[in-house]
């Protein structure tokens, strides 16, 4: 726990989803001064950006920025390509078509740059190794490798102000994440998890993200108040 009179800055990657919102709440509970960062990268679920903006206001982040980048032209992902359908949930060990190449590397790089501007040595990201659909950039080994790179590649790093990338959800399943968030007062109806939510944030109910969310609430024995299309 940090001294409330001397808050330490942290950049929080905030998508507007369940995991990133819980991560922001955890950072706030640890008394970090939070700066939230979201991305408009051409994703189909544009409503999650509105969720991110609303959540940043509710948690009173010191600043919330939305960075506009285009990954649709260089990415063959169902999340960014209108010609590729988001598939229904399926149990598979293969990396799914919803994987966006290098997405977390790009997002963390922006967070790293902003953290240097803010003279900040802490970044929070809501990845986890259990309910992550097989994405390679959600693993602890990847995060550690990025952290090493960041401290070799930045002015702060070589001057001894070492960056720490916090992954408070890394070993939690969805039910544990939900329980943690509820204990911190999160209203999960404000979050958007679905890969193809409509403009009002209503979830499809059949994609991987929706199924993991449904299962999480079921296992947590908490009513799921998410608005689903099906």
From Swiss-Prot:
Please list the GO terms describing molecular function. ATP binding; ligase activity, forming carbon-nitrogen bonds; zinc ion binding
**Pfam families named in the record:** QueC
Its family?
A: Belongs to the QueC family.
| Cofactor(s) in the UniProt record | Zn(2+)
Give the co-factor note.
Answer: Binds 1 zinc ion per subunit.
**Residues engaged in binding Zn(2+):** 194, 204, 207, 210
Stored CDD domains: QueC-like
Q: What is this protein called?
A: 7-cyano-7-deazaguanine synthase
Q: Which organism is it from?
A: Vesicomyosocius okutanii subsp. Calyptogena okutanii (strain HA)
Q: InterPro entries given for it? A: QueC, Rossmann-like_a/b/a_fold
Q: Per UniProt, where does ATP bind?
A: 14-24
Catalytic reaction equation(s): 7-carboxy-7-deazaguanine + NH4(+) + ATP = 7-cyano-7-deazaguanine + ADP + phosphate + H2O + H(+)
What pathway does the annotation place this protein in?
A: Purine metabolism; 7-cyano-7-deazaguanine biosynthesis
| GO terms, biological process | queuosine biosynthetic process
Q: What are the EC numbers?
A: 6.3.4.20
Q: Which UniProt keywords apply?
A: ATP-binding, Ligase, Metal-binding, Nucleotide-binding, Queuosine biosynthesis, Zinc
What the protein does comes down to: Catalyzes the ATP-dependent conversion of 7-carboxy-7-deazaguanine (CDG) to 7-cyano-7-deazaguanine (preQ(0)).
Coiled-coil stretches noted in the UniProt entry, renumbered to this chain: none
Looking up NCBIfam families in the UniProt record yields:
7-cyano-7-deazaguanine synthase QueC
Q: Which domain of life is it from?
A: Bacteria
Q: Give the gene name.
A: queC
